[in-house]
């Protein structure tokens, strides 16, 4: 395997880093979150108790 010059490794590292950052930014901003309605997703009945001390 031929040796590569250090400047080549540096360029490859920067290209990989920039690609990784762009990929992560695109995944972060392209994610569309659609929340469910709270009344349908949570069926919790609250019992109100009046404590008389």
Swiss-Prot record:
Family: Belongs to the ATPase protein 8 family.
Bilayer topology: Single-pass membrane protein
Molecular function per GO: proton transmembrane transporter activity
Any single GO CC term annotated in Swiss-Prot or TrEMBL for this entry: proton-transporting ATP synthase complex
Subcellular location: Mitochondrion membrane
Membrane-spanning residues: 9-29
Alphabetized UniProt keyword annotations: ATP synthesis, CF(0), Hydrogen ion transport, Ion transport, Membrane, Mitochondrion, Transmembrane, Transmembrane helix, Transport
First and last residue of the signal peptide: none
Principal localisation: mitochondrion
Lineage: Eukaryota, Metazoa, Ecdysozoa, Arthropoda, Hexapoda
Description of how the protein assembles with itself and partners: F-type ATPases have 2 components, CF(1) - the catalytic core - and CF(0) - the membrane proton channel.
Protein name: ATP synthase protein 8
Superkingdom as given in the UniProt entry: Eukaryota
Species for this entry: Anopheles quadrimaculatus
Function: Mitochondrial membrane ATP synthase (F(1)F(0) ATP synthase or Complex V) produces ATP from ADP in the presence of a proton gradient across the membrane which is generated by electron transport complexes of the respiratory chain. F-type ATPases consist of two structural domains, F(1) - containing the extramembraneous catalytic core and F(0) - containing the membrane proton channel, linked together by a central stalk and a peripheral stalk. During catalysis, ATP synthesis in the catalytic domain of F(1) is coupled via a rotary mechanism of the central stalk subunits to proton translocation.
Biological-process GO terms, alphabetical: proton motive force-driven ATP synthesis
Cysteine pairs bridged by disulfides in the record: none
């Amino acid at each position: 395997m031929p040796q590569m010059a250090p400047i080549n490794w540096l360029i490859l590292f920067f290209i990989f880093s920039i690609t990784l950052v762009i990929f992560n930014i695109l995944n972060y901003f392209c994610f569309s979150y659609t929340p469910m309605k709270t009344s349908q997703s949570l069926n919790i009945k609250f019992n109100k108790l009046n404590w008389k001390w």
